[in-house]
């Protein structure tokens, strides 16, 4: 079994088998493979129930008893993916890694993803064992083989990682952290070109503890996460390797949870990746991987394997998984503490919000007004000029252009634009030309017009706007539609959902910091209303009102503390419990508030992704988010989008829209990540 650090808790899913008898197991395997056909059920049941150390003893005893190589017999009797999985389980981990790397660099082409996964994630000790195992198994030098099969900075970083010399100090020098941040910044963002050697040296040698502090300081200093700089400064396999290293520094289990999800999502399964990870992590951190997988993807690893594989192969993988975490949102007690600590860190870090559209330099409203008039005069319309001007001016500058246009030509720019452009492009351009509060007011009005109500739009706007933005929306709504927003919401919605929306529409959310004592009380209210408290108290109607008050009026910093206390109190994530225990519009509203508090840019990244995935595009949502966030946090949304969906927002827009609408959206997007 894997060696456990003193005082550490074992987080693998496979344990030493009690009352283990290597002779008896060797005999059982021999019997299972004797005669015509083989008893695959017995083979998988036995091998997946033994630790790696015990399997090595079985191999030895099998050879002593029968004079045969157990692995060779298994290869002969089994086939396909099931054979690969069982044979990998029978090898010591270092030899399993060595075989994977040998396969990755043999023949035509190189499996760079396999090289990256193994070399970015292994500890110093595991790396030394890998090098020795490779030498023993193939009588070749691993470093020489990697140098012969790779090139450039990618090769250099692989060689650095292969040395297994990452620092292990728990004591971190603040001065060295600051120096490394400065060196990385100067090597990338501040340099014409990139000094890759600095990235290789720092990310390849510093301790994990040190690098986590470097990443935190880098974000504070530059306003962007280290991943964004890597994507901007590096490219190709080298970029992928460095991003994998950063992910493993931050959280190795999260890195593998992502790899497993990507191995099974979409059409087809990447079985080699699935096998490699399930085998290599089964005695290290599978419980942590399972927990992160469930929290991140809202489904258990067990259920995804069950739905994506079949036969004995599936049964063996499920045994390695070790259990189905079907209580969505519930943390293992140990993982709850990790989640609690993550909230502590997120409370400390302050991410600077940045839009993609800012005020144009050398702004000349007179010239812009004339250019727009020319673009719309005569036969045909010059859409390119309209897009270029409107998407590259701030909203305040656009209002000046509107005023100047009227002063010069005695015409309403909005009316002229309406008559010259149409469809999705018109919705986008006209939205950009409106003051933000009036634009939001119009979106709310449209959501309540006609038959049926667009609850999703009401929730999206009211759950995410600041107090100042909400108050401005109220004024704009009254001015434009001669009716208060509250009256409109009252007449168009009902019940608890109406109360939530009206509460949000008052714009009276507290704006102070956290109150720890109050946070504990609020967490208890949440636990009681969501029916997971040990000692529920008070009538349900009163609790519902208090819960609504907590989510709709407490400040964001305070609510983050409430969510943290909720985890501590219940071992559950509040978002998952709301999804499980509530329903309909009330559930959607509360989930939106929680997601906005946790990470508002990620909330909007999800909205954008869902507006473009699957058959057809939800152009209205796509337009609304791109218009409303372009000067606030669209750059942050872009970063969250690529981090979660493994493709850039730019790529998603390019693949899902077309023509002038696409050009205008890409201009707002502000660049490719």
Swiss-Prot record:
The modification Phosphotyrosine is found at residues 30, 201. GO terms for cellular component: collagen-containing extracellular matrix; cytosol; late endosome membrane; lysosomal membrane; melanosome; membrane; mitochondrion; perinuclear region of cytoplasm. One of its GO terms (biological process) is apoptotic signaling pathway. The modification Phosphoserine is found at residues 13, 422, 537. Signal peptide: none annotated. The modification N6-acetyllysine is found at residues 63, 68, 75, 81, 306, 370, 418, 483, 620. It comes from the Eukaryota. InterPro entries: Annexin, Annexin_repeat, Annexin_repeat_CS, Annexin_sf, ANX6. It is found in: Cytoplasm; Melanosome. Keywords: Acetylation, Annexin, Calcium, Calcium/phospholipid-binding, Cytoplasm, Phosphoprotein, Repeat. Annexin repeats lie at residues 20-91, 92-163, 175-247, 251-322, 363-434, 435-506, 521-595, 599-670. GO terms for molecular function: calcium ion binding; calcium-dependent phospholipid binding; calcium-dependent protein binding; cholesterol binding; GTP binding; identical protein binding; ligand-gated monoatomic ion channel activity. The modification N-acetylalanine is found at residue 2. A pair of annexin repeats may form one binding site for calcium and phospholipid. May associate with CD21. May regulate the release of Ca(2+) from intracellular stores. Belongs to the annexin family. Seems to bind one calcium ion with high affinity. This is Annexin A6. It comes from Mus musculus. The lineage of its organism: Eukaryota, Metazoa, Chordata, Craniata, Vertebrata.
